[in-house]
Amino acid sequence: MPKYYCEYCDIYLTHSSPVGRRQHIHGRKHISAKIEYFQNLLREEGITPQNFLGFLNNRNINNPLGNPMMNYMNPNMYMKYNPMKSYHSYSMRSSHPYRLNIHNNKYSRAGYVPPSHHKYSVNPMHNNYHQAHNNYSYPNSINPSNQINYSNNYGSNNFNNSNEFNKNMNEKDNINNNDIHDNKVKTDENDPINNDNLNNTRNFSYEENHYSTDHKKPSFLNPENSKEHIESDIS
């Protein structure tokens, strides 16, 4: 069995078992050699702490080392530049062939938001941008920003509808009040109530005249006639 070679320490390990490799990787000598290796690499590239951020911004996106997502397409890239770590791909052992190597922690979940950040942005331009560029939402799903806009629009519509309803009711009340006032001031001869009262008065006077004229009997409305009529009935 070939012995394991450490590129950072430039030695062959006496014990090539996983336990021996783990002990060597956590050893002080290996850590110091690894730090020195990367310091020399940065010095050769001309990278200093002052221009390190600029170097990160100017990286080529197609570079597998600059773009970590490229490592999922070619899992051997990590082993090519890091021979110390034994290669055991989680995605190859998984039953799902398209499952990526994503650890199950709270920071890798899709809906995780740090406590100091708002889950929904308060900037309307930010929400509109994400709505226009959100190509991964399902057709039947509603974005949280859409729900907020929908609730605001629904509430404003209800408020406007209630105002219109109250306005219409007030107009109807004013019309009814004006009609009642006009009826009190003016007496309409075509009004059925007035006609009934007028007819009753006419009928009463007609009956009185008819009774007193045709039958030649005194009217009951005259007090003297009523007295004579009562005395005649008694006798």
From Swiss-Prot:
Start and end residues of each stretch annotated as Disordered: 131-235
GO terms assigned for molecular function: mRNA binding; pre-mRNA 5'-splice site binding; U1 snRNA binding; zinc ion binding
SUPFAM superfamilies associated with the record: beta-beta-alpha zinc fingers
Biased composition annotated in UniProt, kind: Basic and acidic residues: 169-189, 205-217, 225-235
GO cellular component, as recorded: commitment complex; U1 snRNP; U2-type prespliceosome
Keyword Protease: no
InterPro entries membership: Matrin/U1-C_Znf_C2H2 (IPR000690), Matrin/U1-like-C_Znf_C2H2 (IPR003604), U1-CZ_Znf_C2H2 (IPR013085), U1_snRNP-C (IPR017340), Znf_C2H2_sf (IPR036236)
Keyword vocabulary terms for this entry: Metal-binding, Nucleus, Ribonucleoprotein, RNA-binding, Zinc, Zinc-finger
Zinc finger (Matrin-type): 4-36
Annotated GO biological process: mRNA 5'-splice site recognition; spliceosomal snRNP assembly
Annotated localization: Nucleus
Keyword Metal-binding belongs to the record: yes
Start-end of Low complexity biased regions: 134-168, 192-203
Subunit structure, interactors included: U1 snRNP is composed of the 7 core Sm proteins B/B', D1, D2, D3, E, F and G that assemble in a heptameric protein ring on the Sm site of the small nuclear RNA to form the core snRNP, and at least 3 U1 snRNP-specific proteins U1-70K, U1-A and U1-C. U1-C interacts with U1 snRNA and the 5' splice-site region of the pre-mRNA.
Biological role: Component of the spliceosomal U1 snRNP, which is essential for recognition of the pre-mRNA 5' splice-site and the subsequent assembly of the spliceosome. U1-C is directly involved in initial 5' splice-site recognition for both constitutive and regulated alternative splicing. The interaction with the 5' splice-site seems to precede base-pairing between the pre-mRNA and the U1 snRNA. Stimulates commitment or early (E) complex formation by stabilizing the base pairing of the 5' end of the U1 snRNA and the 5' splice-site region.
Family: Belongs to the U1 small nuclear ribonucleoprotein C family.
Protein's UniProt name: U1 small nuclear ribonucleoprotein C
Lineage, uppermost ranks: Eukaryota, Sar, Alveolata, Apicomplexa, Aconoidasida
